């Protein structure tokens, strides 16, 4: 449990990010509210890319996978490294196109290249994916608070959602970027705590190279594909690419954020192996939280609450804003429900409020972090695979694009209902994506579509 000092630190953190959000929101125009005026420099871009990626999906889910599967979970990170390396080259092209066409969201890429139907399908997937990550991070933040304090899980979910909503309503995307700088400092403090734990613990993580191949082949493929395709279909990463000032800052920030991400991932692997050895038979999805509470000294354990919460918060605010942007710009504006001459910031604020309420409700229902991650990562495959296909072959016909996205949606939801949620959903998603493209090629041969 936390002491008075710990509670004061948490309260101070909440106060700082709220003040930053309010001050950021003053005298903003539409472009600044939506995408920071497309003028992010290397430092801002590096911190916001890095901190948005170090959320529940990496801190809790990845540690849970290490706790369950040992060194074999590293395949997820190996896939991520390859995916980020590929995105380094792809992102340059996207950046150039976004600057010329004024893109704001990932679906804008599909609207521009493959038409309205593909754009709306991409919008549907984007909203589901990003909202899923909102729920996942709400759940993670609430479990963290409930583990360390007398506050119940249900009330913790409300606290997490309301705090994030308040500074987003005030400052928009600029608030996300500026609070990410604060939260990146917290993540580096977490890095220091993890190093301290590795040095002081009597248990040393065992790294046997052959343990990488101890998993069944299908699990290895699933973990690798999950990591590989995420950058190509991460709406929040695309939004940051659009917001960066130029290609030079893009290349520098993506390289640095990827390097920091890789370092944190390796340290988390070691921490997960230590917790797996020292504290068997605990719930995997809270293994990092429980591990810190039991293995760190009392004062440092309290500090870890603030740091882990700041990491989860930095992802939750990103995904909530990205979801709201896609709902408002890709759906309400493009379908005519919201007129462009209307106050877009007001519409987005109502959207964020509605999404926050829905997110809290879903977080009260869906409490398994690992299963939720597999489900939403599988849906990510639909956009990631098609985006890669379009990059490799820009003339890919619209039938293939539309059917691949739609087939993946079916190929994830139906097996999840019938078979259940596991890492095998990623293989189903991959297979249905390929099938959709092939069927589209056949249909296009019979009835050619516009490119």
Language-model-derived ranges and their functions:
Residues 1-451:
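Membrane-embedded helix-loop-helix hairpins and adjacent transmembrane boundary segments
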């Amino acid at each position: 449990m936390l002491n008075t000092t710990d509670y004061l630190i948490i309260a101070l953190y909440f106060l700082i990010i709220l003040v930053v959000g309010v001050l950021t929101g003053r005298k903003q125009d539409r472009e600044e509210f939506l995408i920071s005026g497309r003028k992010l420099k290397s430092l801002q871009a590096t911190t916001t890319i890095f901190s948005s990626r170090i959320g529940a999906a990496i801190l809790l889910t990845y540690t849970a996978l290490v706790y369950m599967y040992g060194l074999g979970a590293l395949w997820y990170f190996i896939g991520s490294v390859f995916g980020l390396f590929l995105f380094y080259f792809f992102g340059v092209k996207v950046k150039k196109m976004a600057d010329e066409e004024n893109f704001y969201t990932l679906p804008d890429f599909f609207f521009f290249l493959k038409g309205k139907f593909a754009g709306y399908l991409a919008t549907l997937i984007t909203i589901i994916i990003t909202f899923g990550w909102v729920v996942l991070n709400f759940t993670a933040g609430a479990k963290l608070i409930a583990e360390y304090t007398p506050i119940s899980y249900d009330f913790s979910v409300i606290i997490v959602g309301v705090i994030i909503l308040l500074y987003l309503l005030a400052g928009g995307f600029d608030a996300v970027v500026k609070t990410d700088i604060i939260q990146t400092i917290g993540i580096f403090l977490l890095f220091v705590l993890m190093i301290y734990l590795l040095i002081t613990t009597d248990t040393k993580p065992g790294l046997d190279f052959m343990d990488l191949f101890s998993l069944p082949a299908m699990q290895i493929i699933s973990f690798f594909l999950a990591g590989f395709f995420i950058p190509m279909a991460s709406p929040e990463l695309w939004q940051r690419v659009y917001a960066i000032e130029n290609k030079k800052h893009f290349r520098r920030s993506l390289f640095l954020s990827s390097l920091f991400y890789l370092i944190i991932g390796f340290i988390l692997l070691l921490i997960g192996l230590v917790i797996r050895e020292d504290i068997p038979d605990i719930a995997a999805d809270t293994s990092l939280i429980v591990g810190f509470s039991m293995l760190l000294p009392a004062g440092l354990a309290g500090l870890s609450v603030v740091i882990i919460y700041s990491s989860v918060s930095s992802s939750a605010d990103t995904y909530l804003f990205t979801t709201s942007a896609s709902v408002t710009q890709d759906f309400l504006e493009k379908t005519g429900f919201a007129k462009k001459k209307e106050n877009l910031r007001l519409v987005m604020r109502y959207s964020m409020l509605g999404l926050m309420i829905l997110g809290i409700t879903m977080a009260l229902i869906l409490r398994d972090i690992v299963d939720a991650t597999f489900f939403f990562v599988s849906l990510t495959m639909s956009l990631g695979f098609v985006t890669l296909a379009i990059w490799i072959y820009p003339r890919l016909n619209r039938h293939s694009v539309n059917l691949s996205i739609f087939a993946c949606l079916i190929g994830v939801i139906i097996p999840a209902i019938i078979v259940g949620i596991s890492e095998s959903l990623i293989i189903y998603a991959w297979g249905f994506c390929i099938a959709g493209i092939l069927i589209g090629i056949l249909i296009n041969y019979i009835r050619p579509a516009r490119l």
